[in-house]
UniProtKB/Swiss-Prot annotation:
Name under which the protein is recorded: Envelope glycoprotein gp160
Function: The surface protein gp120 (SU) attaches the virus to the host lymphoid cell by binding to the primary receptor CD4. This interaction induces a structural rearrangement creating a high affinity binding site for a chemokine coreceptor like CXCR4 and/or CCR5. This peculiar 2 stage receptor-interaction strategy allows gp120 to maintain the highly conserved coreceptor-binding site in a cryptic conformation, protected from neutralizing antibodies. Since CD4 also displays a binding site for the disulfide-isomerase P4HB/PDI, a P4HB/PDI-CD4-CXCR4-gp120 complex may form. The surface protein gp120 is a ligand for CD209/DC-SIGN and CLEC4M/DC-SIGNR, which are respectively found on dendritic cells (DCs), and on endothelial cells of liver sinusoids and lymph node sinuses. These interactions allow capture of viral particles at mucosal surfaces by these cells and subsequent transmission to permissive cells. DCs are professional antigen presenting cells, critical for host immunity by inducing specific immune responses against a broad variety of pathogens.
Domain notes: Some of the most genetically diverse regions of the viral genome are present in Env. They are called variable regions 1 through 5 (V1 through V5). Coreceptor usage of gp120 is determined mainly by the primary structure of the third variable region (V3) in the outer domain of gp120. Binding to CCR5 involves a region adjacent in addition to V3. The 17 amino acids long immunosuppressive region is present in many retroviral envelope proteins. Synthetic peptides derived from this relatively conserved sequence inhibit immune function in vitro and in vivo.
Sequence motif YXXV motif, residues: 701-704
Post-translational modification: Specific enzymatic cleavages in vivo yield mature proteins. Envelope glycoproteins are synthesized as an inactive precursor that is heavily N-glycosylated and processed likely by host cell furin in the Golgi to yield the mature SU and TM proteins. The cleavage site between SU and TM requires the minimal sequence [KR]-X-[KR]-R.
Chain spans, region V1: 112-156
Region of interest called V4, as start-end residue ranges on this chain: 391-414
Ranges for region Immunosuppression: 569-585
Region: V2, residue numbers: 157-199
Entry keyword annotation includes Transcription regulation: no
Highest taxon of the lineage: Viruses
Region named Fusion peptide: 506-526
Chain spans, region V5: 457-463
Gene name, Swiss-Prot/TrEMBL: env
């Protein structure tokens, strides 16, 4: 008897466990979960010039940041934000400078005479050493005749071309910068055979008009439904798989458009310290300079410059200098405590965790790239008021490195070129010769672009021409994310089970970023506020879209529907599309407009359950990412079956309403069923009757025609 009781109790416990221990999939809407995204960002600026207005929306300064208690990976080089910045600044650059007419290169042989000036950009005088450091009160700054500076090196050329008149050649005279032509070295006489140095290019682009390239400040903003995360760790060096100080933002900080090699100008990341962003897999670096040293660069191009157009043939015009007029060289002066700043760079490099070279700063040197590199690499290349300067940095490097027996100056000679290698895409642009009058540019030097080649005996910091690296420093601590508010987790509650009544409460709308405030909280704590969070999400999305719509309305250029205009307008509808997509997915599971939705689908993996008090939703989502597809499919199948069951139930329950008894269509249908049943019964009785009659006949029946009796 006792054994039977124990068996009964065990069976009860087993039944209870089967009922209550089964875990079911529960859908949560409004969880703080995100994943990396790569959608287009839109830019905002306060610059009101024409081309900047076309490219970006007006800036309204209505942005916020919220600290998150999470750990996230950041990479300045594998980053959609920095890549978009490079692409967009290139677009701004081309829009401003406007090299817009494509021409066939001028590749005829020319007879040229060299008119060598006193000193040239490419080979500054180094036969006699000189140490000249100019200051604010130096007279040569005003007269542009500092030691070593001379006139531009030019070449006077003659060549024949046809085109203006049929089968008739015309002799042209043209003066070129010596850097824009290549002469045959075998010629020893004064008159040499020369070609333009772009003749190996199939198509080049010539500037339509002379334009300024003034830097502009702008910021990037994420479309509604997306956000930007920023690593706020002071030790962040461009690559950090576990950044623990993370903030969420709708927009980036303001940044400057920068286009230069060797140095970055007017950056926004300078602090009272020197720090280095280092590529995670090679020796590329971008070094942020300490703003304490007040490092600036002043570039000047003396006046007395004239330009004349030369018509080569119909539709082909080149602009040139008048013959035998040589302008004075452009030059750049480096102001500030440069030697101290460079020493601090070396000390910072020696302490960097990625650095494996010598710790002796005397063996760490700044060097220039090889002379055989492209001009933009071999020289410091920058843009001053629309003109492209190529500066030979030999004097400067000798000065900061204190190289004895070498010419040392804190200024360098520069050369202006018409034919430019594009810095972002492979190609060449031909720009108009420099405009007349004096040009002056003053910029703050905030960073160095360099490659680090370290060794036990010596380390070389080689200046680089990677313009894109400037934006790794400006925006490399950001990453773009897409908020995915739908989450799955196992619970013991099955659909249609009674749930505790929740008291209603007001929602404090923090905007869209308020949606992420519980990202660092445990799953259980975050789940308690899902109802408020989902409403916050929708309210924040609508608010964010309204702000974007306001700035679009304020920009009249958007009515032209340029490429950027359509891009920014598309950003406005991204969040609604995303929200509707989420709701459509929830609806396919029978969970539309619910914050917590219990289902009848059993949890697929009993060993994988969340610790509601010690794990965040972001961590949990990473664990079950491989199961989400199967869970989603199971939820859809369960919802389809649920709808079928509901349909059948509704058919059975259709007679419980008294009015349905008087529905003629229902009566006709069931009358048909009755007729079918009666006819079936009649047919069945007829079959039974025939069978019975045959059975009786077989028992007493003799055949009428039987075999005749046999007679003996």
């Amino acid at each position: 008897m006792c054994g039977r009781n124990q068996l009964f109790v065990a069976s009860l416990l087993a039944s209870a466990c089967l009922i209550y221990c089964v875990q079911y999939v529960t859908v949560f809407y409004g969880v703080p979960v995100w994943r990396n995204a790569s959608i287009p960002l839109f830019c905002a600026t306060k610059n009101r010039d024409t081309w900047g207005t076309i490219q970006c929306l007006p800036d309204n300064d209505d942005y916020q940041e919220i600290a998150l208690n999470v750990t996230e990976a950041f990479d300045a080089w594998n980053n959609t934000v920095t890549e978009q910045a490079v692409e967009d600044v290139w677009s701004l650059f081309e829009t401003s400078i406007k090299p817009c007419v494509k021409l066939t290169p001028l590749c005829v042989a020319m007879r040229c005479n060299s008119t060598t000036a006193k000193n040239t950009t490419s080979t500054p005088t180094t036969t006699t050493t000189a140490n000249t450091t100019i200051g604010e009160n130096s007279s040569c700054i005003r007269t542009d005749n500092c030691t070593g500076l001379g006139e531009e090196e030019m070449v006077d050329c003659q060549f024949n071309m046809t085109g203006l008149e049929r089968d008739k050649k015309k002799l042209y005279n043209e003066t070129w910068y010596s850097k824009d032509v290549v002469c045959e070295s075998k010629d020893t006489k004064k008159e040499k055979t020369c070609y333009m140095n772009h003749c190996n290019t199939s198509v080049i682009t010539e500037s339509c008009d002379k334009h300024y390239w003034d830097t502009m400040r702008f910021r990037y903003c994420a479309p509604p439904g997306f956000a930007l995360l920023r690593c706020n760790d002071t030790n962040y060096s461009g690559f950090e798989p576990n950044c623990s100080k993370v903030v969420a933002a709708t927009c980036t900080r303001m940044m400057e458009t920068q286009t230069s090699t060797w140095f970055g100008f007017n950056g926004t990341r300078a602090e009272n310290r020197t720090y280095i962003y280092w590529h995670g897999r090679d020796n590329r670096t971008i070094i942020s300079l300490n703003k304490f040293y007040n490092l600036t660069i002043l570039c000047k191009r003396p006046g007395n410059k004239t330009v004349v157009p030369i018509t080569l043939m119909s539709g082909l015009v080149f602009h040139s200098q008048p013959i035998n007029r040589r302008p004075r060289q452009a030059w750049c002066w480096f102001k500030g405590e440069w030697k101290e700043a460079m020493k601090e760079v070396k000390l910072t490099l020696a302490k960097h965790p990625r650095y494996k070279g010598t710790n002796d700063t005397e063996k760490i040197r700044f060097i220039a790239p090889g002379e055989r590199s492209d001009p933009e690499v071999a020289y410091m290349w920058t843009n001053c008021r629309g003109e492209f300067l190529y500066c030979n940095m030999t004097w400067f490097l000798n000065w900061v490195e204190n190289r004895t027996n070498q010419t040392q100056h804190n200024y360098v000679p520069c050369h202006i070129k018409q034919i430019i290698n594009t810095w972002h895409k492979v190609g060449k642009n031909v720009y108009l010769p420099p405009r007349e009058g004096q040009l002056t540019c003053n910029s703050t030097v905030t960073s160095i672009i360099a490659n680090i080649d370290g060794g036990e005996n010596q380390t070389n910091i080689t200046f680089s021409a990677e313009v894109a690296e400037l934006y790794r420093l400006e925006l490399g601590d950001y990453k773009l994310i897409e908020v995915t508010p739908i989450g799955f987790a196992p619970t013991s509650i099955k659909r249609y089970s009674s749930a505790p009544v929740r008291n209603k409460r007001g929602v404090f709308v923090l905007g869209f970023l308020g949606f992420l405030t519980t990202a660092g909280a445990a799953m259980g704590a975050a789940s308690l506020t899902l109802s408020a969070q989902s409403r916050t999400s929708l309210a924040g999305i609508v608010q964010q879209q309204q702000q974007l719509l306001d700035v679009v309305k304020r920009q009249q250029e958007m009515l032209r529907l340029t490429v950027w205009g359509t891009k920014n307008l598309q950003a406005r509808v991204t969040a609604i599309e995303k929200y509707l997509k989420d709701q459509a997915q929830l609806n396919s599971w029978g969970c539309a407009f619910r914050q917590v939705c219990h289902t009848t689908v059993p949890w697929v993996n009993d060993t994988l359950t969340p610790d509601w008090n010690n794990i965040t939703w972001q961590e949990w989502e990473q664990r079950i990412r491989n199961l989400e597809a199967n869970i989603s499919e199971s939820l859809e199948q369960a919802q389809i079956q649920q709808e079928k069951n509901m349909y059948e139930l509704q058919k059975l329950n259709s007679w419980d309403v008294f009015s349905n008894w008087f529905d003629l269509t229902s009566w006709i249908k069931y009358i048909q069923y009755g007729v079918y049943i009666v006819v079936g019964i009649i047919v069945l009785r007829m079959v039974i009757y025939v069978v019975q009659m045959l059975s009786r006949l077989r028992k007493g029946y003799r055949p009428v025609f039987s075999s005749p009796p046999a007679y003996s």
